[in-house]
Amino acid sequence: MKVDYLKKIEQCIAYIENNLTHKVYIDDVLESTYYSYPHFHRIFMDFVGEPITSYIRKRKLSCAAEELINTKKTIIDIALDYNFSSQQTFNRAFTGYFGISPLKYRNNGMLDDIYKPFNFKDCFFEELLSIPVSIERLQPMKVASYHSFNGNIKLKNSRQEQEKEISKAWGNLIRWQMSYEYQKQYGATKKLPATRELGKFMIDQNHHLPPYTRYFGFINPFPMNCNEFGYETWAMLTDISEHIKTEVQYKDIVIKDYDGGLYATSEATYGPDSNLDKVWKSLHYWLMQNQQYNYGEHQWLEEHITKSGEGGFHSFKLYLPIQPTR
C-alpha cells in the first residue's frame, strides 16, 4: 500500500506550527508518520529544504521576531513563550540567526530574514524536473569510510558550515586512499611522495575510476538538534591487501562491509549551480507516482562521479532506496 508522504509532511508541519510555543519533540512530530526518524528525516529535508530540527528552530525564532515588532511584550516574555530557558539563551539563539540582538531588531522596527512556514503549492511542484529514472541494484562491497561531524553548526550559515564538513570528509578519505593505493603497489616501506604526486599516480593508474573504485557520500547521523551535522564518505576497495591496510594508518578511517540494495537512480550536476536538491525532490515525486515501489529502509547514497585523466568530482548519481510495494 502506497503512503501519501506529502500529506504526512503537511501533517508534521501543521503539528510544528501549532506547537511553536511549546517544547517540540521529534518523536511527537513523527507520531503520525509511523516511520523512524532516520527514514523520515531524509524525505522531509529533501521536500522542505531543511532538517526537521532546523525548521523548528527557524520558525520559533521567526515568530519571536514578529512578536518583537508587532507586540509590546517584553523580550523575556517572548523568550519564555517560545520555550527558551532564559532571556540569555534566547538572545544567543536570536543573534546567531538574525545577526543582531532582539533589542536592536525591535528598535530597527522592521521585519527581516523571516523564515516562513513551508507551503507545498509555492515551494514544491515548481521545482520538479523531468528526469530519467533507472532501477538498479547495488551489489555488496567493501568500503573505506571517513565520518566528519560538527556539533556546533551555526543556524545562520548552516549550509556553508555543512559544506566545510563535507569537504573535510572527502579530503581525509582521499588522502588515505591515495596513500593506501600507492603503498599497495610499491610496498609499505616506500616513502610516500607529496600529495600532488599521489594524485597524479591515482589518475595515471586510473585508480580513481570504476570499476577499480567508486565514491559515495551521505548525511550521517540525522541531526537531533539544529546545531548538528555529520557526513560520511566511502571509497570502494578492490583487491584488498590486509597487510597494507594495517600499515597505512590514518585517523578515523574505518573499513566496512556494505550489503547492497535496490535503488531508483538519477543523475545530477556538480558545482556551484548543481541541481542536486531539485533532482532529489524529483526522485521523491517519481516514487510517489509509482505504484510498484515504496521507500526502502537501506542507505541513501550520493555517488560522486570521476572522469578519466582528471582529478576531482564532476557529477552526481543519486540512489533512492526502494522496495516493491506490498
Outline where the language-model segments fall.
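Short amphipathic alpha-helical segments
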Residues: 10, 27, 167-171
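Basic/polar phosphate-binding segments, predominantly the helix-turn-helix DNA-binding elements
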Residues: 23-56, 79-101
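Short, flexible segments with low predicted structural confidence
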Residues: 1-3, 11-12, 27, 37, ...
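A short, Lys/Arg-enriched amphipathic alpha-helix from helix-turn-helix/homeodomain DNA-binding modules
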Residues: 2-24, 57-73
